């Protein structure tokens, strides 16, 4: 039987029209963006997999209802870390995987990260500050899983571990 995989993703901003322009997303409208994000997610994640969602799921009226409807459409067991646009989820979580310690948090500049000695996996910065917050930053020990950086689909923790072991900066997943 195949193992459950662990995936990470942040900042989908479902239903948020302005994010398309603000973050230069390759979609012509919200419907196309929502459909593509759902399809990409479900092409990668199986029902038994775990997805750590690091904040900013959806921006819309009737947010709670819309979020519930949206979650029905997404594969996997989803663990929420609260983003700056969310009212639910843990503030952060620390996990160990393959001998590494990871803090999962929305904003890497949060005071929670100050004395943490492992790797910080975060969102929040989208692809707006890639020099400081690229996909993989060995110097800062940070990993940016905002959708714009990981090509709009969840990224596996196995791939992240492989990349941090190489010790090189990776600006976006498209640079691999």
UniProtKB/Swiss-Prot annotation:
SUPFAM superfamilies: Metallo-dependent phosphatases
Domain of life of the native organism: Archaea
InterPro entries: Calcineurin-like_PHP_ApaH, Metallo-depent_PP-like
Molecular-function annotations in GO: hydrolase activity
Protein name: Uncharacterized protein MJ1445
């Amino acid at each position: 039987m195949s193992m459950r995989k662990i995936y990470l993703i942040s900042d989908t901003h479902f239903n948020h029209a302005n994010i398309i322009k603000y973050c230069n997303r390759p979609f012509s409208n919200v419907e196309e963006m929502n459909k593509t994000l759902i399809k990409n997610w479900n092409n990668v994640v199986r029902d038994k997999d775990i997805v750590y969602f690091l904040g900013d799921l959806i921006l819309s009226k009737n947010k709670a209802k819309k979020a519930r409807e949206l979650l029905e459409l997404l594969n996997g067991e989803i663990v929420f870390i609260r983003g700056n646009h969310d009212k639910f989820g843990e503030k952060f979580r620390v996990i160990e995987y393959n001998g590494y310690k990871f803090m999962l948090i929305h904003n890497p500049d949060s005071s929670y990260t100050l004395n943490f000695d492992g790797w910080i996996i975060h969102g929040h910065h989208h692809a707006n500050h890639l020099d400081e917050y690229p996909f993989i930053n060995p110097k800062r020990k940070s990993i940016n899983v905002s959708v714009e950086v990981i090509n709009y689909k969840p990224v596996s923790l196995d791939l992240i571990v492989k990349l941090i072991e190489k010790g090189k900066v990776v600006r976006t997943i498209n640079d691999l």
